[in-house]
């Protein structure tokens, strides 16, 4: 009998041990955006310009605050206008990572670490991401020297470009990290989708290029989203009939603006519950709705008007237009 009990006890212990080994630690996920803008006025035959540079970072962070995965991308969007106040039509906006070898950094970049190789932008971003893995946010901040380039570790990894915006975006991403169902086995991806609306200046009204840039970070497993974060940046370049223009240097996303965005005061109660949530609250509702879906499922969250969400999304409290968020979320989930 004792032998039987001993065997049974060992079996139970083995089952418990294997059950414990089967548990996978869930991680926090965060997304951060660092963006700045600059502008030059038009002068004679030289067009004025407006430029938005927005870097997005996504991180998976463990219980010790160490980065398990990191993803980066940058949108460098430029627009022009003439000295007569005419908005020049913008072309397609493609991120630096998505440009791949077409960014052509290898042909014109500098060999700052002396190894005889200049990597493309996306390769250098990959190198910086790899250096971040296993580090805390303070250790990532310590990678930056002279306010612009990376230290010897970053350089040796093959990332010789300026990394100040990378560091700032990663710092924000870690600060924004929240508990999720994502694990180290998941795929992490970021996405940026940009659009611009333009109008010419008149004698009585300013012209403008108005950007809307949507960001998404998705952790996926088997094609299904385990964690999602979304955000949007609005940036406007106004110019007069002579092409004079100014722009704010540093920009805040709508999530960062929080209650200062003031959607609750002026938004519409489209679902009839008597409540209008702030933009960041509605974006959180949208992001939550994406969890468990694949890219096609996220696309299906958009109603037939191609602007608002479906009824279930509106009932949950996301009554604003979500087409740009959905485009970014779909791209991140693919």
Predicted regions mapped to residue ranges:
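Active-site- and interface-proximal helix/loop "cap" or "latch" segments in soluble metabolic
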Residues: 25-334
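Sec-dependent N-terminal signal peptides of Gram-positive bacterial secreted proteins and lipoproteins
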Residues: 2-22
